């Protein structure tokens, strides 16, 4: 229940504002630690990790950091947005990573307005998926999900990511419900190992949702593994 450390917030703010630092490094610093990393740190310190408490603490950290960086985030995102043709190299990749890290925080401040704009203007998959993730993370993005599916429905690899993204960013109390709905989607083929993993593995990867007190995710996972095991025991075992 502790608040985010003022020293941590100040340190991240200094890194965010320092234009002499490598953009890729600044992006890493702006990203919140993964829930799995937080759980491992707690376990190593002799504590029993609580997925729900970790989820709440991480959300609180994100809110505090977004508030601290609020004065600089819009200008940072604008500076890092390349309006010319897409180029792929280490420098531009670092700029995109920093832009999306800043966008994830800004989405907590502006309700997703900047993310919607970047999604609409995206000329590369990194920006498109990244902006969509930012929207899903704040409980929005349904129109963008529909547009994404309409555009990429014929690309299996991309659609695997579309399925997984929705579950990865689902709120704990909605994770099982969203996963169940996706297993009823016309493009969900449980006999396709990659599509099955994109959905069920993503469910297991959403720790707070998977371990929700309702037990709904446990039941859903068990039902699907029992169905898959006779046909594809190797995938079921994974």
What are these regions (language model features)?
Residues 1-238:
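Long, ordered, helix-rich scaffold segments
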